[in-house]
Curated annotation (Swiss-Prot):
A Gene Ontology cellular-component term: cytosol
Protein family: Belongs to the transketolase family. DXPS subfamily.
Binding site for thiamine diphosphate: H78, G119, H120, A121, G152, A153, N180, Y291, E374
Purpose: Catalyzes the acyloin condensation reaction between C atoms 2 and 3 of pyruvate and glyceraldehyde 3-phosphate to yield 1-deoxy-D-xylulose-5-phosphate (DXP).
Binding note for cofactor: Binds 1 Mg(2+) ion per subunit.
Protein name: 1-deoxy-D-xylulose-5-phosphate synthase
Annotated pathway: Metabolic intermediate biosynthesis; 1-deoxy-D-xylulose 5-phosphate biosynthesis; 1-deoxy-D-xylulose 5-phosphate from D-glyceraldehyde 3-phosphate and pyruvate: step 1/1
Keywords, alphabetical: Isoprene biosynthesis, Magnesium, Metal-binding, Thiamine biosynthesis, Thiamine pyrophosphate, Transferase
Cofactor entry: Mg(2+); thiamine diphosphate
Stretch list, region Disordered: 305-325
Quaternary organization: Homodimer.
Sequence positions that bind Mg(2+): D151, N180
Length: 635
């Protein structure tokens, strides 16, 4: 990136100059932004197509509002790259999604333009309603509030909770519905169909063009001409379409309009500012706009691998050749569905991320993508399960948090054998704290009836799923985004609540839960000739193997527990609870886990090392532990 190549962006310390830029300058800035995005994708995987689609919308917003004092919330936040580029972060943009660099999501620690650190979908309207309410109470009524939410996130239940509240309060608020007909994959559901009807209704499309012509003739808003225009729109729209969903909720609906026409959006944004009460502006955009490969395949280019050229050819990178756990999970699900016609799979808009496309194609009648509606996904699974079906909820660990109450009431309390496949459990590297799946161990093991397990290597994943589908209780299987370790031994059969001993040791034992088994084995191998370290594949955190806990602590040798999850309430805590229940001496237990803080973004191996979870750091802890034990016995 050079100043000569991107002079408009390089000259921005904040977004205030955009208010005085001409249409030509704004259009040129859009070209610069897309060039920067393409340059970035030559170096790393990042959110791409969604950012390409909001370039003009971002420029229009910053040219009409001053978001140093006004409020702007980007729902989910993966589409904030243009926003970062025009708010003074151009010079640091090449650090995005790298350790110590810019986050790939909004981050208040970076800029006053970012209000919330986000990454999950659906809450923008709620926080915007709250911001507006608070500003009114704090006598800050001149501050304007804008929420930008995509049509993929719009069906979230919390969105309609917010609209319900916004309509009742009646406070001034602008909601931008960024409609690109996509979530990560193609969106699903009746809300999507409703938005399609709004986009395609020939009567309203004609009305839109007439309103556009009138807008062109009205230089300023807030006068009788504007009010007349608004009344005309309301009357004609009501006559053509009847009572519309948003209008019936007390939300003024405007649109749909072209989300790539900056002057047009500027005029409509001014209309929104002058319209009293909550307003929803329906903006139609194209995901991947301005870059042909992304526009033609927005699913692949949502977060594509790094480019080899501007044609979108992926860079060939070195690989350990091992498929990720996600691939093994998909294959195990497919095999289970072949064997048993009662097995279904439910995902919440993560078909691509969970690599479920082959399952969807082979078993379309038993595949359910419910959209970004995790609470519904879990309750829906409970309903299926009650009829005798065997549903699998295939979901990212961090997104399962959104359905906590449904796990409690609809599944655990009913003791229904729903299977939760918790993908992306552990560190998700460059996505940062909103996407790390580090809390599921703690919050899932709280519930009675739930059986919780984690594979230490690839072969175990299918074994665990097969076992889970035989249970009469709910169960969860956690696994990371990482490539899967392949067993070098014949795996022991899966027995509920039983660990697997990988190797015996005379000096101490490492007890690893899940994918941390790979680091445990590597650490033990590093110490060969120095210490004889046993390695245990815990397999279960609930019920934990009490006999294994007793055996590892019975001879006074040290024990190191490993988990790719938070230290509080995790596997190490479960290990100590079992030890205390058995009245065992726990002084030689060392818990290695992620710290009790929000882990930022970076390379997974780097983050593991920082958290004392790399093989090298684990080996160092073992040396220290052995020394402590030796000094205690007088050696």
């Amino acid at each position: 990136m050079t100043d000569q190549k991107h002079p408009l962006l390089a000259g921005l310390q904040d977004a205030t100059p955009l208010a005085n830029w001409s249409s030509t300058e704004l259009s040129n800035a859009a070209v610069e932004i897309r060039d920067v995005l393409c340059n970035l994708l030559a170096t790393r995987t990042a959110h791409f197509a969604s950012n390409l689609g909001v370039v003009e919308l971002c420029l229009a917003l910053h040219s009409e509002f001053d978001f140093r004092t006004d409020r702007l919330i980007w729902d989910t936040g993966h589409q904030v790259y243009p926003h970062k580029l025009v708010t003074g972060r151009y010079d640091r943009f090449e650090t995005i999604r790298t350790a110590g660099g810019l986050m790939g999501y909004p981050n208040p620690h970076e800029s006053v333009y970012d209000l919330f650190m986000t990454g999950h979908a659906g809450c923008s309207v709620s926080t915007a309603v709250g911001l507006r309410s608070g500003d009114i109470l704090m006598d800050q009524k001149d501050r304007r509030t804008v929420a930008v939410i995509g049509d993929g996130a719009f069906p979230c239940g919390v969105v309609f909770e917010a609209l319900n509240n916004a309509g009742e309060l009646g406070d001034d608020l602008t909601i931008i519905l960024n409609d690109n007909k996509m979530s990560i994959c193609h969106r699903t559901g009746s809300v999507a169909q409703y938005l399609d009807r709004l986009r395609g209704n020939p009567f309203y499309t004609g009305l839109k063009h007439e309103v556009t012509k009138l807008l062109d003739r009205v230089p300023m808003f807030g006068d009788p001409a504007e009010r007349l225009l608004a009344q005309m729109k309301e009357g004609v729209k009501a006559g053509l379409l009847g009572g519309m969903l948003f209008e019936e909720l007390g939300i003024r609906y405007i649109g749909p309009i072209d989300g790539h026409d900056i002057p047009l959006m500027q005029k409509y944004l001014r209309l929104c500012k002058e319209t009293p009460g909550p307003v929803l502006l329906h903006v139609v955009t194209e995901k991947g706009h301005g870059y042909k490969p992304a526009a033609e395949d927005p699913v692949f280019f949502h977060t594509p691998p790094a480019f080899e050229d501007r044609g979108g050819t992926p860079v060939t990178r070195g690989s350990d050749g091992r498929p990720p756990y996600t691939t093994h999970a998909r294959d195990a699900i497919g095999e289970a569905m072949k064997r048993d016609s009662r097995v279904t799979v439910i995902t919440a808009a993560m078909c691509q991320g969970n690599k479920l496309e082959p399952v969807r194609e082979q078993f379309p009648e038993r595949f359910f993508d419910v959209g970004i509606c995790e609470s519904h996904a879990v309750a829906f699974a409970a309903g299926q399960c009650k009829t005798g079906m065997r549903p699998i909820v295939d979901i990212y660990s961090t997104f399962l948090q959104r359905s906590y109450d449904q796990i409690f009431q609809e599944v655990a309390l009913q003791d229904l054998p729903v299977v939760f496949m918790m993908d992306r459990a552990g560190l998700t590297a460059p996505d940062g704290p909103t996407h790390h799946g580090v809390y599921d161990i703690g919050y899932m093991r709280l519930f009675p009836n739930l059986v919780l397990m984690a594979p230490g290597y690839a072969e175990e994943l299918s074994m665990m799923l097969d076992k889970a589908l035989t249970l009469d209780h709910p169960s969860g299987i956690r696994y990371p985004k990482a490539s899967a370790l392949e067993a070098t031994h014949t795996p022991a059969p899966i027995e509920i609540g039983k660990a697997e001993w990988i190797r015996e040791g005379t000096d101490g034992t490492i007890v690893a839960y899940g994918a941390m088994l790979e680091q445990a084995i590597a650490a033990a191998e590093q110490l060969e000739g120095e210490l004889e370290i046993g390695v245990v594949n815990a397999r279960f955190v609930k019920p934990i193997d009490a006999e294994m806990v007793h055996k590892t602590l019975s001879d006074g040798r040290f024990v190191v527990t490993l988990e790719e999850g938070t230290r509080v309430g995790g596997f190490g805590s479960a290990f100590l609870e079992s030890a205390v229940d058995q009245r065992l001496d726990t002084r030689a237990v060392h818990r290695l886990a992620l710290p009790d803080e929000f882990v930022l973004h970076g390379d997974r191996s780097q983050l593991l090392d920082q958290s004392t979870l790399s093989a090298q750091k684990i080996a160092e802890v073992c040396r220290e532990a052995a020394s402590e034990v030796g000094s205690q016995v007088g050696i």
